[in-house]
Amino acid sequence: MGLQTTKWPSHGAFFLKSWLIISLGLYSQVSKLLACPSVCRCDRNFVYCNERSLTSVPLGIPEGVTVLYLHNNQINNAGFPAELHNVQSVHTVYLYGNQLDEFPMNLPKNVRVLHLQENNIQTISRAALAQLLKLEELHLDDNSISTVGVEDGAFREAISLKLLFLSKNHLSSVPVGLPVDLQELRVDENRIAVISDMAFQNLTSLERLIVDGNLLTNKGIAEGTFSHLTKLKEFSIVRNSLSHPPPDLPGTHLIRLYLQDNQINHIPLTAFSNLRKLERLDISNNQLRMLTQGVFDNLSNLKQLTARNNPWFCDCSIKWVTEWLKYIPSSLNVRGFMCQGPEQVRGMAVRELNMNLLSCPTTTPGLPLFTPAPSTASPTTQPPTLSIPNPSRSYTPPTPTTSKLPTIPDWDGRERVTPPISERIQLSIHFVNDTSIQVSWLSLFTVMAYKLTWVKMGHSLVGGIVQERIVSGEKQHLSLVNLEPRSTYRICLVPLDAFNYRAVEDTICSEATTHASYLNNGSNTASSHEQTTSHSMGSPFLLAGLIGGAVIFVLVVLLSVFCWHMHKKGRYTSQKWKYNRGRRKDDYCEAGTKKDNSILEMTETSFQIVSLNNDQLLKGDFRLQPIYTPNGGINYTDCHIPNNMRYCNSSVPDLEHCHT
């Protein structure tokens, strides 16, 4: 008999292999849980040791952990054990909010992201960064790092560093010797006043540079400092003390340039000439009054330009900006060009200005401002032409004034006489009603805007509260409403013309008196101006009082009718209800002092006493007493009592009565 052998089934081997894999996985998970420090909490690849008042990093950080949270503790520089450096799986460490005063040693060797902000780090050594060859992102914000506290070439030891954040420290200059592969550098909110030409010499990969909130001036920036940043895409130098944009800005890849909150008062023509890829430019909150013509010509890819809060002076030098704003493509968004001077155009948008009306020098050749007047022109100005529909309406013409005609030098050097303002503007007044006046004017030259003022005059012609209205140059009339009847107003028209504007000489005034109120046509004329004014001011209240009085009168009448009707109805009901008669005063007088319930009162004129159920009448005396009512009933002659009125008038009845 031969030996029989059985072959292990293939599915059994597969089952054994799967069971071994699952067992090893469970063992690894259990080992990790058992290896988690007792003061921490472990969750998969994360170890949470934050906010536990630790003074050192706990021992026993297991291998396989990728993120280590140690922030908001009291860890100092002596609290980093040497074995922590050998944990190779950790790539992110959070250590912000601790008590470090130096850059820590013995950090995990393969860490890539390190958060050290909100400590008190003052010094950074080369040896500390030399341990972190794979460090890519370093956050050192909110520390006490100074320029002398950074060892020369310290950051260069971190050869893989891409992002370096040094915001809110005590740096007085940009550290020299930064890693060549650095892509983003933030040194904002420091005390940097100087940037040497060696600071960015080898940073050919830098794409984002933020130097906001420092003490930089144009003298503190070395020539050619930024020319080496060939890959720079965003440059922000906000809140410094620059008087003009930094020169030699790299234009190969620059897309965003922020220059706001400086002291920039002029921009050279070539400042942006190389920035052909620039898409966003911000020059807000500076001291710019004008711009050199053509300064934006090479910004072919510009998408947004912000120029808010600059003292733009809208004279001849800003004409090209107005023209440029009218023809920019729709893809370009421009904001902030608002005139701050001269006074007559303050608050107007530069885009809406009429280029022919901007304040230009009077000596501009080939551009005569006005038609020359003959040399024999009279020096006396003529009053404005006024068209008044009704001659009976009160109107006081302006008093002619004498002034010397201004002369403007012509382009060939000869002087020409400028016509007076009254000859170039005609003013007319139309009375609409007793409280409204329509003022119209006609100008012989183009005016950018007008200012119309009016004031009510008193007995002494001393002006009161002046009201004014600014209207555009295209408008030729304005209605003055809510005026007081029978009042004199002084109306002045000021052309806000940018050509040699003179507030006194270029003002034309006139006086007009409104009609009396139509409500006073049938009454006597007011004795004084104050009475007319008082009546005019009280007319709305008078009308309201009349309406209110009429309503009250109607309500009183209706209430009186209702009360009378109810009283009449109640009296009729009381007469009809016989049991109420005894309650009247007359009945009580005739019946006695008070009604007695033992007295059977009969109201009929005749009656008969009969027995009930054939029973005998009760023996006793019955006394019949007639009651004589004043409104009728039994006559006193029906009884033998001759004088029953005495019974009513006395409190004791008579001795004689009728008996049965």
UniProtKB/Swiss-Prot annotation:
Keywords: Cell adhesion, Cell junction, Cell membrane, Developmental protein, Disulfide bond, Endoplasmic reticulum, Extracellular matrix, Glycoprotein, Leucine-rich repeat, Membrane, Microsome, Repeat, Secreted, Signal, Synapse, Synaptosome, Transmembrane, Transmembrane helix. Expressed in pancreas, skeletal muscle, brain, and heart. Residues 563-660 are cytoplasmic. Residues 36-63 form the LRRNT domain. Residues 373-409 have a biased composition (Low complexity). Residues 373-413 are annotated as: Disordered. Glycans are attached at residues 202, 298, 433, 521. Its main location: membrane. N-glycosylated. Proteolytic cleavage in the juxtamembrane region gives rise to a soluble ectodomain. Cleavage is probably effected by a metalloprotease. Residues 36-541 are extracellular. GO terms for molecular function: chemorepellent activity; fibroblast growth factor receptor binding; protein-macromolecule adaptor activity. It is a single-pass membrane protein. This is Leucine-rich repeat transmembrane protein FLRT2. It comes from Homo sapiens (Human). The lineage of its organism: Eukaryota, Metazoa, Chordata, Craniata, Vertebrata.
